[in-house]
Amino acid sequence: MDRQIPTPENPWLALRNLTPARIALGRSGISLPTSAQLDFQFAHAQARDAVHLAFDHTALSEQLKERGRDSLVLHSAASDRNQYLQRPDLGRRLNERSVEQLRQHAKTNPGGCDLAIVVADGLSALAVHRHTLPFLARFEEQAAADGWTSAPVVLVEQGRVAVADEVGQLLGARMTVMLIGERPGLSSPDSLGLYFTYAPKVGLTDAYRNCISNVRLEGLSYGMAAHRLLYLMREACRRQLSGVNLKDEAEVHTIDSENTSNQKGNFLLGEG
């Protein structure tokens, strides 16, 4: 006669409310339950789709125009998606036509600008489609109060982070902010990354950039991301640097932070 073997209580179960990570999924014998396996396969498919989704720069350009913002549509040196994925170096530079387009814009608009905002598909065009406009609405509203001048929003197809350095250099921008789709995770196919650089020029390494990651509804809010970015920009202008020598020390007071600031112990274990 078959006897049901009791399953021991999973001590990780209580932590599922604190993270979207795949923990405490349960088991069927030595395998995952069917529901957990199907969820994993669905999330993996979403991540793959996000990587290969085409960047709809035409729609984004029209939406920016409706909000009173001009834009320039450029292309990296990577000719297509396959080359972009196989040759990261080509995604860091503009193609010749785009370089000439920026040079012509700089000639007709001499004097440079304080800020160049660059938007690239990166590894998740889905993130750019979902979060660019809501974030810019929060960010530019606050940035305008500081009196910074901005170039048209630059949309780069098949672009990587460093392509913003070339854009900023050609436009004569004092600062660049890159909005780019981050590498999709199994719980975050639409995560937007922000990369800030002071005095951009071709050849800078990641050490000269500041990153604000996981901007999305389930991650870092648009308002919080804008607050942190503006702090970095103000400090960069004051100290004339960015990257590893510029730390994000922006103070953000929330109800949760005030309630937990005096607590001791490990919150995961229910201490304090």
From Swiss-Prot:
Enzyme Commission code(s) on record: 4.3.1.7
Cofactor: adenosylcob(III)alamin
InterPro entries according to UniProt: EutC, EutC_C, EutC_N
GO biological process per UniProt: amino acid metabolic process; ethanolamine catabolic process
Reactions catalysed: ethanolamine = acetaldehyde + NH4(+)
Family membership: Belongs to the EutC family.
Annotated function: Catalyzes the deamination of various vicinal amino-alcohols to oxo compounds. Allows this organism to utilize ethanolamine as the sole source of nitrogen and carbon in the presence of external vitamin B12.
Name listed for the protein in its UniProt record: Ethanolamine ammonia-lyase small subunit
Gene behind the chain: eutC
